[in-house]
Amino acid sequence: MEVSIFLRKIKEIIKEDPSKLDWIPTKKNRRTRQELGLSLQDIEDSIITLEANDIFRGPEIDRDIPDEILYIFKKNLESQIIYIKLKLRDNKIVVCLSFHIDEE
């Protein structure tokens, strides 16, 4: 799926029902959230404001779940570059696998 179509779809899903955003609380994600003082609403807002030119990589196949496609973005937030990895599950759940300070 083209990145602009992917973004339009995930934004519609999140705006319609924010509970459809599944933020995965990995150690890196939790650390970034704590260091930057981010709420889940801040993370949601950052995802909602992503643009096609924020794409870093993708679409690419998820190595853990080959039926799912990943999109990786980088976005400036709180003077940091944030690495954001998203996918759409079953066309109805937005999964945020990564939302952490970029390590590259």
What are the functions of these language-model segments?
Residues 1-2:
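N-terminal intrinsically disordered, low-complexity regulatory regions
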Residues 5-67:
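Compact soluble domain cores
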Residues 25, 58, 73-75, 85, ...:
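Intrinsically disordered, low-complexity regions enriched in small/polar residues
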Residues 29, 33, 75, 96:
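Functionally constrained cores in energy, signaling, and assembly domains
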Residues 63-89:
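Basic/aromatic recognition patch in beta-strand/loop cores that engages polyanionic ligands
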Residues 81-83, 87-104:
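Enriched for short, Lys/Arg-rich terminal
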